[in-house]
Structures are given as structure tokens and as C-alpha cells.
Amino acid sequence: MKLTNVSKGTTRVLLIAALALLFCSTLLDITQSAATPPAELECPADQTPTATSQPALVERYQQTITPEALAARLYFLASDFFEGREATTRGQKLAAEYLASQYRQLGLAPKGNAKTTDPLSPSAYFQPFTVYKRTPKQSRLEVLSQGSTVASSTFSAETHDDLSYFLTGNAAAAATGGVVFAGYGIADDQLGYNDYAALAAKGISINGKWVMILADEPLAADGTSLLPTADHKLSPWSALSLAAKRKALIEAGKPAGVLLVRYASPRMQGTFADNAAQASLAAQRVGPLSLGQSTFPPTYAVSVKLADQILAQSGRSVEELRRQINQSLKPQVFEANGVTVRTSLEQFGGLETENVLAFIEGSDPRLKDEVVVITAHYDHLGLNPTLKGDQIFNGAADDGTGTVATLELAQAFMRAKRDGHGPRRSVLFINFSAEEKGTLGSAHYALREPLVPLERTVAEINMDGVGGFDPKHPAKSRNYVYIVGSGDLSKEMIEANRRVKELTNINLELTEGQNFPSDQLYFQAQLIPFIYYSTGLIEHYHQPSDEPATIDYEHLARVTRLVFATAWQVANQDARPRAVDRSQLKLDGYVCPPCGAGCDTVVYDHAGECPVCGMILVPKYSGAGVSARR
């Protein structure tokens, strides 16, 4: 559906929300009356059996998790009316209120910390936190020579020119400094090319200076790499994320800022002015967010015209330098003569978003202070009015599936509790916001403001994308789920998952998966035993086509039932999953969690934001029972 049709839906949202509440209320009443267990399954409330000791009891409640109920929830949550649920937007806040209303209807207690005078308000379930845009409200870049301004450029959501535009980095800090030309900004000894080694050999420091680098890598006319890569395919140095170049820059020093020269090439789409206009439009949307100020220096894309003005005092030009490097494959680096770059920025104010937390108190007086946390993120990518056709990213698989699964899990646990089989340990459900912005909701909760003390958090179970299929699984082999853990930290969780799958007759192939960036990372960083369920990166990943109709609801129900059995086992077994003994560990510094950008090998002496990819740094421990990268 196009954006023009979205604005008419506010009244319809409220109507559909009311109908959804009525549907769920009716469904709950019907299934509650049908879920009374036979007498032979009765037991004292504080002695609820585990899945391994009485699998028949667990199966009874598993079967209340149905494809129909999951579909009913997902077709609503991932509809156009929520406008893609982008963090901080109206759609995300409507989704948060929907989730809170569902938890209230199911009988779960609120566990948020939002200030409210009405304990029955949906906000009682909210954990609000502040995020910041990674683009400035306005930026100005000036080129100074002998104290006079020789060129200037202004960029904002309303204004742009053909000289520069803001790309990334610290969107609040002003910066002034000289200029160092660092070639392509590549440091790759395996490929035999290292601009920063060439600077060091000349005794040139980048500290406190603007570093000018060329986009991409040395390219042939057909767009292939001139570097000795396999089959001359492009290397990571040409990635649009700039992750490799940012990592090399941070390892080389502490520059004042970065000037990325974008020139006409086989990889550049449109003119520089076209790209500046697109960046200006993008700045009007929410865009990338952070929990605070970025520690990476401000980075601007600059045109060849502006770059040549900066290099004029040195008697050099971009095309001349690029030609020399491409022909010789040897770095051309130098400190520019008689020129200073000065920038000033105006920052947007903070924006608020919310995690949603709901709580089931444990039934065992000895164990109820211990908590099993079940998580999924409910935000997605929002909408993009510049697209032709469908402009809404509905996020059905990512992570509408995990979100509706948490509601069904909550309902199944509450049914069991009303029948006298409440979990011995407490269970906390958290639906995180801003996962798509860099797992910000879970980082805020686990690293800054855990509303249940982490020492009482015995395990975390995360679901992210559990209803679609990745390209590795053709139609005949789609009865699978990826199980992700981390060595000894997750060993007992994964074993419990395997045992309950067999005992409760769930027909799923368990496949070991890689540790995708998702909300489990920050619980892992706090050394909390965890398990993460996913069906991988689907064909429609981060596309408007990620719609409810693409989901296999029978498969989603099987995965959700498996998660329920695992959570039941952990919540009711006598011993909590064995965790790493913190007293045996040494804090070595802080690293980026495994984000896929390759920046998790750099160790910092401070907490905060990864200057390369923007994720929140986590503690790095060494010692007994923990690997070097935890």
C-alpha cells in the first residue's frame, strides 16, 4: 500500500484494535475452559513439574498455541496500520500500546518503570528510553586558507548543495583541523596495499586532522577491483557501510573528521548532487539512531569539486591522484598545505521509544525471585515515501513472528497458572524497541537499566524471525529452526531444548546457527545463559514484501511450542542453568558484540558506542570458563 493510503487509517486502527481485543478475549475464554487438566496431572502449585518429568502436562499447554491464533495476531500487528513500527514513530507507539493491552487482557502484571498516575494505563508496561538521530539538524562545512573562507557548504533535511553532505559519525561536535590525504583509506597488507603504513613511513600523524579518503578501492573501467583479490572481485574496502575503512581509521589514530570523496565511477549511481538530494530526503525520516553521541568522528561525503579546492594549495587534484594510485597500486599520501576545514553542527533533540515488559510471578517461594526472561523485538523499519509502489516495511517475519509468539507463550503460561501449574520461577516477557537501529532496546535494558537485577536473571530466551525460511532450505527441507548459543554459557540451555523437543514430540530439525546480531547479545555480554531461536535471513528480509501472507503458520506454531517447552523446563527445574563465575574472570576491556562488520576484534579501554558500527560496546573477559571473545 502506498503512503498516501496510510494517513487515512488512524480511526480504523482504533477500530481494528478493539476488534482484536474482543477476538483475543473471546479466544482466551474459550481456551481457558478447555484447558483444565485431568486429575492425574494435578500437583501443588510450588511443585510444577518439569517438561522432562511430565511431558504430557507440557504438551497439553503446547497444543493451545495454534497456527490460527498466531496468524490472527500477526495479520494485525504486521498490517499497514502500524506503518512499519519504526522506533519513535506513531506506528511503534501504537504497537507498544497494543502489546500492553494484550498482556493486560491475559492477566500479566506490568513491569515497566514509566511514570504514570494511572496503574491501569498501558504505560505501566513501558520502559521508556531516549535515542538520538545520527544525522544533524543542520551542518556547515567551511574550507579556510590563510584565515579566509574559500568554500562553504550547508546541509540539512531542507537544504543541500553539490559540495558536501553529512554521512555519519558524531552529529553534535564541531571540528576544526588541517587535512591529510590518505589515498583510499585502505590498510590491507594481505592485498599489498596500506595507505596508513605509508603515512606512518612519512611521519605524518592523522590525530586532530581531517582525513580525506577516496570512495571504494582502485577500480578498473568495468567496476572490478585492481587489487589482487580473487577473480578481481570487490573487497570489503568497497562496502557501502564503510566498516573496513572506519576500523582502519580508528586503529590509525584520532582524526578530527573524515572527508570521503565521491567521484564518477561504475559504482556511483547518479551525480553527486543527486546523492546529496537523497541524503537530504533521508534526513527528514527517523533514520539511524544511537543511545548517545557517536564516538566516530563526523564524516562528510564531499564532491570532487570541493576536494580539489581543499587540495589546491598542494598543487594536486583528485583525478590526478586517483590515476597515479590506480596505475601503480602504490599509496599517494601527504599533508595538505595551507588549508583548514571547519565544521559546525546543530543536533536534533532526543526522541523517546519504549520497551514493553510483562511479568508472571513464580509460584515457588524459594525460586520466585529468580527470573527467566523471554524476548523478541517488535520494531521494524517503518516506511519509505520515496519508494514506488509498496512503501511500508511491515516486518511480519522480522520480528512480528517473535512478537506474536511472546503473546502466545504468555497466554499458555497464564492458562497453566490458572490451572494450578504456575511456573516456579518468575517469567519476564520483554518486547524490545529499536533493535533495527542497532539492538538499542536490549542494550539499554541489559547494560544500563535492568528492571530485574541481572544476578536474579537465570536465563534469556530470544526469538527473532521464527516464521520464514532462508534460501538454504528448499521447500522439502523447511522443518527446521536454528538454535544459537555460546559455548559453556549456553550448553545447558541447548541440552534442555534438545531433551524437551524429543519428549514432547515436536517435529523440528535443530540446526546450529551463527550468532546473528539480535537482542541476546547483551545478555550474553552479561554472562547470562541464553538460547536464541531463528529461521535465518529470509528472501524478504528488510523488504516491503515481508508480509503476513509469506509466513508458514504451522511451522511458526511448532517453533513457538518448542520455545514454550524449553522455557517451562528452565522455569521449573530445581537448579538454575549453570552460569560463568564472575569472580574467576578478568575484565580486559570492551569490544563490539559480533555484529558482522568485523569490528569485534578491537579492544577499547572504555564502555560506550563502537566507533566503527555504532553498536554498544560490551565487556571482554578472560579467565576460567570464558572464551577470549564472549
What would you call each of these model-derived segments?
Residues Q47-R90, L106, P110, Y125, ...:
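N-terminal capping segment at the start of a domain
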Residues S53-Q54, D161-A198, G203, L291-G395, ...:
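Soluble metallo-hydrolase cores and metallopeptidase-like ectodomains found primarily
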Residues T64-P110, S145-S148, Q190, G203-S205, ...:
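Catalytic-core environment of secreted peptidases
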Residues E83-W210, L214-T224, E335, S344, ...:
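Noncatalytic luminal/extracellular "stalk/propeptide" segments of secretory-pathway proteins
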Residues F155-L291, T295-P298, E361, Q391-N394, ...:
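Extracellular/luminal Protease-associated
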Residues A157-E158, A172, P288-L289, T295-R316, ...:
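Metal-dependent peptidase/peptidase-like ectodomains
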Residues Q411, E539-L585:
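His/Asp/Glu-rich mid-to-C-terminal helical/loop segments that flank catalytic regions of hydrolases
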Residues L585-R630:
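Intrinsically disordered, low-complexity terminal tails/loops enriched in metal-binding residues
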